Regions:
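Conserved HGGG/HGGXW glycine-rich cap/lid loop of the alpha/beta-hydrolase fold
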Residues: 25-78
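Active-site loop/oxyanion-hole signature of alpha/beta-hydrolase fold enzymes
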Residues: 26, 36, 67-107, 255
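Short alpha-helix in the alpha/beta-hydrolase fold that links the catalytic acid
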Residues: 57, 205, 219-228
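Flexible "cap/lid" loop of the alpha/beta hydrolase fold
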Residues: 114-122, 128-160
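Active-site nucleophile elbow and catalytic-triad environment of alpha/beta-hydrolase enzymes
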Residues: 183-199
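Short beta-strand/loop motif that positions the catalytic acidic residue
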Residues: 203, 209-211
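Acidic catalytic loop of the alpha/beta-hydrolase fold
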Residues: 214-218, 243
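Catalytic active-site module of serine/aspartate enzymes centered on a nucleophile-bearing elbow/loop
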Residues: 233-234, 240-278
Length: 278
């Protein structure tokens, strides 16, 4: 295992400045992860854009031991072995074992949300609670990011693209390494993951599903599919947020997620006919 004080390129003001970088050998991959904070472990699985830091993760690290894992195939080594999201999730489980975690909360974003759901199914005894941010397993009405013109990409991911000082397009080398994996596990698959749908009703882990009400990648109504299939699921729409909820509404995202992790159902109003529910 190797460690650095902060992630490369991070200043004291930039997201991720308080995270240290580590690597573990697991399943034939050298896997990088970033860690910050103390308390109960919160494992974070990134989206198709790879491991990135956000103010939301900085805020969560004030209350939890946050471990953001770069999934196999998103680092310097291509992943040519995994054919399904379930296989990728099993490899992530091996990484978590190598890190030495027993029980943990689990947060997955978009592509990582689909992986997190499969991981929770594979290791339900290890996952304390599950948070899925715009998860990509059910994508009715969605748009493949590869088909979005570059000039429209930021607006699909962020509600207020004008607030992003500089938008850097994806690195071509990174895309060449990772996109075949993304397409193989997600892009070329049906928009409805039937295999996952068949297993979710047996997953008793308490789950929070969040979508931005202006998501331009995966329409937020797909959150209702998760709520219908999962026995212990709550679905929340975050106002004035697009696909990247952490980027659009960092404080709101952190407030909802931290309350859910700490208090579970006690932080939510029960659904009633007299209340407006998603």
């Amino acid at each position: 295992m190797s460690t650095t004080s902060t992630l490369p390129g991070a200043s004291q003001q930039s997201p991720g400045a308080g995270f240290s970088e580590h690597t573990v050998e697991a399943g034939g991959f050298t896997v990088r992860y970033a860690e910050s904070g103390a308390g109960e472990a919160l494992v974070v699985l990134h989206g198709a854009g790879g491991l990135r830091h956000s103010r939301a993760l900085d805020l969560l690290a004030e209350q939890y031991r946050v471990l953001a894992i770069e999934m196999p195939g998103f680092g310097q080594q291509p992943n040519e072995t995994h054919e399904t999201m379930a296989q990728l999730a099993q490899s992530v489980a091996v990484v978590i074992d190598a890190i030495g975690l027993d029980r943990f909360h689990l947060l997955g974003t978009s592509f990582g949300g689909a992986a997190a759901a499969h991981l929770a199914i594979a290791r339900p005894d290890r996952v304390i609670s599950l948070v899925l941010e715009a998860p990509a397993a059910f994508r009715e009405g969605s748009t493949n990011p590869a088909e979005i013109p570059p000039e429209q990409m930021l607006g699909r991911f962020r509600t207020h693209p004008e607030r992003v000082p500089v938008f850097l397009p994806p690195d071509p080398d990174f895309m060449a390494r990772t996109w075949p994996l993304v397409e193989r596990l997600l892009g070329s698959r049906p928009v409805y993951d039937q295999e996952l749908a068949d297993q979710l009703p047996r997953l008793m882990v308490r789950t929070l599903v969040l979508f931005g009400d202006r998501d331009g990648i995966i329409p937020p109504h797909n959150g209702r599919t998760w709520r219908r299939l999962l026995p212990n699921c709550s679905f929340i729409l975050v106002h004035d947020a697009a696909h990247d909820i952490q980027g659009d509404r960092a404080e709101a995202f952190t407030d909802v997620v931290s309350d859910w992790l700490a208090r579970g159902w006690q932080f939510l109003l029960p659904e009633q006919d007299t209340l407006i529910n998603p």
